[in-house]
Amino acid sequence: MGPSVSVSERKRQAIAAAALTLFARDGYERTSVDAIAAEAGVSKRTVYSHYGDKENLFLLVVKDTYELMRERFAEVVERTLTDVDDVEKSLVSCIREAIATVSQSPERSTLIRLVLTELPRFPVLMDLWRNRAILPLLGAPIARLAAAGLLNADDPDQAADHLSALTLGQVNNRSMMGTVPITDAETDQIVTSGIRVFLCAYGVRRD
């Protein structure tokens, strides 16, 4: 049984979820604190006590959602790319799961729509995006695989960039950043073919 969550924390989570939904649906300008409070089932005063004002609420909700995506990705990478025997199988498992739990998650689709809409109003969103990018999380496990003689990657970060472009990037393009559904078969084809191309460049050839 997990740790109990305080009433205050439950209210904060409800406010954040309501704010993300309403900001994405109605835009920052048209979303009122009254509407967020009503959606969350709390008082307007409670919203202000947790987040200060609407702008601070908006930025914190975006930051927290970015962080949630990053934590999910890190957990997938750690679980699937530790103690690797079959590199291709492990990479396919990692990327497939990352797509299912991160790239195509409802939260990410909502976040992408929100950021693209509000970026002109809040240029700081680009900094939040860069500072919490998930791509660097692939560099360390690729370095470990290279050190173990399972990959030939002199520059693990560049290899991570290539792996992402061939798999996650292609899925993002096909699904318009997770806002348009694509089939599991399409996703599998992109992932498996992308990883095979990646291994043509970075795989260790066995004689």
Where are these regions (language model features)?
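N-terminal intrinsically disordered/low-complexity leader segments
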Residues: 1-10, 73-74, 154, 206-207
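Hydrophobic/aromatic-rich alpha-helical bundle segments in the mid-to-C-terminal region
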Residues: 146-196, 206-207
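Amphipathic alpha-helical packing segments from all-alpha helical-bundle domains
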Residues: 104, 110, 123-148, 157
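Helix-turn-helix
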Residues: 14, 18, 22-56, 60-63
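Short helix-capping/turn signature of helix-turn-helix
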Residues: 28, 51, 114-122, 133-134
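Hydrophobic alpha-helical connector segments
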Residues: 74-108, 112, 159-160
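Short, basic, alpha-helical segments at the C-terminal edge of helix-turn-helix-like DNA-binding modules
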Residues: 63-69
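Amphipathic alpha-helical segments used for helix-helix packing
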Residues: 102-127, 172-177
